[in-house]
A protein has these predicted regions:
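Active-site machinery of serine-nucleophile hydrolases
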Residues: 186-253
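Short beta-strand element of the alpha/beta-hydrolase
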Residues: 174-186
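C-terminal catalytic histidine-bearing segment of alpha/beta-hydrolase fold enzymes
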Residues: 331, 337, 342-352, 356-394
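Aromatic-rich carbohydrate-binding modules that target alpha-glucans
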Residues: 37-83, 91-113, 148-153
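Gly/Ser-rich "nucleophile elbow"/oxyanion-hole loop immediately N-terminal to the catalytic nucleophile
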Residues: 171, 175, 234-278
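A domain-start/cap signature at the N-terminus of enzymes
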Residues: 105-177, 365
Length: 394
């Protein structure tokens, strides 16, 4: 779900009562400060800021606010000037700030002075009530269904909604199909459940099928909201958390995939089993391919947040050359978030690491940097068809 339903187009201003602008040090930085949050907000709540400066990502780890004495603050790393729009969230658009009735509100707006240095101070009145929040119409195609609203994740001691896409000819054929596993399932198929836009994976695959592609089954697992960072990194980040990625990948490889293979006409081998994600989902997809190359033989890594877990580089360098080698498809943008050079640099470093292990460019390894690419759903939606075709083609 997008902020104010249309986060980028919505230009309504909202100045929170009591907002204060204060002079800041002579640096091109903006500090955002919350002096209070709604009663009942957990003491250990992860509060994020999402805005036009980070692609409206509701749970970007580098935009998590720091708690201090009952208040929360963050200083943006990137220079900003002029008007900015933003909202505060608890890690998803289903838990963004709202009004006292639990409904969505317009984006906050603030014009940074010409120096680019300022502090915005405000308060959150309430968090959105998902039960009363208006939602856009569903955009999922007929091939999409909910495999389970509460699929057991024994490895993590919780449940999760899991989505399923079946190819157009699944019901009328006896074919077996490759399977692609995706993260952040809320964003994969349906605008009614997505935040900041959906990928349109179902429409993309339907179109490719109409042009002669053999088709694929897609299994998309919802992220866990405030558990997202924990589940999408095998290693702890001192500031942002993490550390449950091993268990999450074990769930995918040992529980979810066997279930799908038992109940649907799949081609279960690694050459027909892919995993793909963006940002933190890109990080955990890469890790899944390294840990289980005999399971996930096709790996899509979009805008990977490798900075979150630098241990991924030593993990890749230590890969056993005797094990199967997956195909890895990397894509990142030259305009990624607050520090695009970090994403470009880290992708290049990982590609060099894999090439040093013998992965062959063009057949086992593909990497591209898109000049216009940003850390945003529209970018990943656009890049999906090319990644899918490269991973499963030939």
């Amino acid at each position: 779900m997008t902020p104010s339903l249309h986060p980028v187009r919505d230009r309504l201003s909202m100045l929170v009562a009591g907002a204060v602008v204060a002079a800041a040090p002579v640096q091109a930085q903006l500090t955002l400060r919350l002096t209070s949050v709604p009663p009942g907000t957990p003491a250990d709540a992860a509060i994020y800021v999402a805005g036009n400066f980070n692609g409206w990502n509701a749970a970007a780890p580098e935009y998590r606010m720091t708690a201090e004495g009952g208040e929360y603050f963050i200083t943006l790393n990137e220079p900003v000037d002029g008007p900015v729009e933003f909202k505060f969230t608890l890690g998803s658009w289903d838990t963004a700030e709202g009004d006292l009735a639990g409904r969505d509100i317009a984006n906050r707006t603030f014009t940074v002075p010409g120096t680019g240095a300022a502090t915005y101070t405000g308060a959150v009145t309430a968090w959105v009530d998902p039960a009363t929040r208006p939602r856009p119409a569903s955009t999922a195609t007929s091939g999409v269904s909910v495999l389970s609203a509460a699929f057991p994740m024994a490895e993590l001691g919780r449940t999760r909604r899991v989505w399923l896409y079946l190819p157009p000819d699944y019901a009328t054929s006896r074919k077996r199909y490759p399977v692609l596993y995706l993260h952040d399932g809320q964003n994969v198929f349906d605008a009614a459940t997505a935040f900041a836009g959906e990928w349109g994976v179902d429409e993309a695959l339907d179109e490719l099928h109409a042009r002669g592609d053999g088709g694929a089954i897609v299994v998309a697992v919802d992220n866990g909201g405030q558990k997202r960072l924990d589940e999408y990194s095998p290693w702890k980040n001192a500031r942002y958390g993490g550390g449950e990625g091993d268990a999450y990948v074990d769930f995918l490889a040992k529980t979810l995939k066997p279930y799908v293979d038992r109940h649907y006409r799949t081609r279960p081998g690694p050459a027909s089993t892919g995993i793909l994600g963006s940002s933190m989902g890109g990080l955990i997809s890469l890790y899944a391919g390294l840990k289980y190359p005999e399971v996930f033989g096709r790996v899509g890594v979009f805008s990977p947040a490798l900075w979150f877990s630098p241990s991924i580089f030593s993990c890749a360098a230590a890969a056993d050359p005797r094990r199967p080698r997956p195909r890895f498809y990397f894509v990142t943008g030259a305009q990624e978030g607050a520090a695009p050079e970090v994403y470009v640099r880290d992708q290049g470093r990982m590609v060099e690491t894999l090439a040093g292990l013998g992965f062959r460019s063009g057949t086992e390894l593909s990497a591209v940097v898109r000049p216009d690419g940003k850390h945003a759903e529209w970018f990943w939606r656009r890049e999906f068809p090319a990644a899918y075709q490269w991973l499963f083609g030939g």
